[in-house]
Structures are given as C-alpha cells and as structure tokens.
C-alpha cells in the first residue's frame, strides 16, 4: 500500500532538516514508517495477503538499514528518530 502524494508531502515537510530536503535519512525513515503503518492496518483485515507481507518485510529491512546508518553517524539523531516515530529497537 502506498501513501498519497499529499500525505507524503506532509511527512516530508514535518521531518525535513531544511527546505527541499527529501533525501535525508530522517525523511526516508518517516516515509517508510508511514508506509509500514498503512500496510500494518491492511493486514488487520487481509490476514492471508502474503505477497504484501513480503513487501512489508522489505520496507522494515530498508528502514532498519537507514536507522543503522544514522546510529553509526550520530547516536543522538538515532535516538530522536526512534522516539519520534515510536520504533521499537
């Protein structure tokens, strides 16, 4: 499940470090978290949708890789990201 362009713009604006920032790890993690939340809601009604479940696992893995990168570069930013998006570690 994808997110709408309007919702994606809101997520980017809420997490951007500066104007026009769409590629920072914070923004990427925020977008992935939004997509993961949408898929999680989808699975509440479609429990046997294993093809989408594989996509969810790929999204979680990508987010995990980005979080590992942020943790390696700056632990304070990493902890702030976990807290802001309610991500369990």
Swiss-Prot record:
Family per record: Belongs to the universal ribosomal protein uS15 family.
Comp. bias intervals (Basic and acidic residues): 1-10
SMART domains assigned: Ribosomal_S15
Chain's role: One of the primary rRNA binding proteins, it binds directly to 16S rRNA where it helps nucleate assembly of the platform of the 30S subunit by binding and bridging several RNA helices of the 16S rRNA.
Keyword flag rRNA-binding: yes
Protein name, as recorded: Small ribosomal subunit protein uS15
Keyword Cytoplasm: no
Residue ranges, annotated region (Disordered): 1-24
Molecular function terms from GO: rRNA binding; structural constituent of ribosome
